[in-house]
Swiss-Prot record:
S-adenosyl-L-methionine binds at W10, L45, E66, R123. It comes from Bordetella parapertussis (strain 12822 / ATCC BAA-587 / NCTC 13253). This is Thiopurine S-methyltransferase. The keyword Transcription does not apply. InterPro entries: SAM-dependent_MTases_sf, Thiopur_S-MeTfrase_Se/Te_detox, Thiopurine_S-MeTrfase, TPMT.
Length: 219
């Protein structure tokens, strides 16, 4: 996935990946992480996800990163927020209370920014990236998070030869290989969701599972 592909999808309204509700799996599994109140939570490729509003409501400082300025502006407009805006080397920052979105490239985040994150939530980032970029993403983003940073990762597992991504299939073997050496990725839930995703069925996908991981950055 290149930047233009992602930006075009937002401009053209091809954003079926956007959910109009908070992700139930986030609500179910996040509390057990015990991320401290006031801790900063990274949400990469954030779009305009309502999950960020929910995380902020848990007393956390949310740091979303999103390439599309349109998505960032829609997030604040649709949630009735008027952000303060400033620029840095990392991108254009939109800040309202404990919600901050950086309109920019997640790979441009500085070491200090990532090291300061106490939590991370990834529902739509890893699965949006093609294989070579997934390796870079895991290494350069997760590999720079601070020791003890905890989070939730949600992926999809389906026969990749039956459908072109994104979203891409990222099975357990790949997750373990991507995070080996710097992050513990423990599979805590797996469920068949094919009957809830008709677009996959229509494209000939015979099996579709969602996988949920508890992440913890190793020292």
């Amino acid at each position: 996935m290149d930047a233009d592909f992602w930006l075009d999808r937002w401009r053209e309204g091809r954003t079926h990946f956007h959910q109009t509700r908070v992700t139930p799996l986030l609500q179910k599994y996040w509390p057990a992480l015990d991320v401290p109140a006031g801790g900063q939570v990274l949400v990469p490729l954030a779009g305009k996800s309502l999950d960020m509003v929910w995380l902020a409501g848990q007393g956390l400082r949310v740091l979303g990163v999103e390439l599309s300025q349109l998505a960032v502006e829609q997030f604040f407009d649709e949630n009735g927020l008027r952000p303060e805006i400033h620029q840095s080397a990392q991108g254009r920052h939109y800040v309202a209370g404990n919600l901050e979105l950086i309109c920019g490239d997640v790979f441009a985040l500085e070491d200090a920014t990532l090291a300061a994150c106490a939590g991370v939530y990834d529902r739509a980032a890893l699965v949006a990236l093609p294989e070579p970029m997934r390796k870079r993403y895991a290494r350069e983003v997760y590999g720079r998070l601070g020791r003890g940073c905890r989070g939730i990762l949600i992926t999809l597992d389906y026969p990749q030869d039956q459908m072109e991504g994104p979203p891409f299939s990222v099975d357990d073997a790949e997750v373990q290989a991507l995070y080996a050496g710097h992050t513990e990725a423990r599979l805590i839930d797996r469920r068949d969701i094919l009957d809830k995703e008709p677009k996959f069925n229509q494209r000939g996908v015979a099996r579709l599972d969602t996988l949920v991981y508890r992440l913890e950055r190793l020292g």
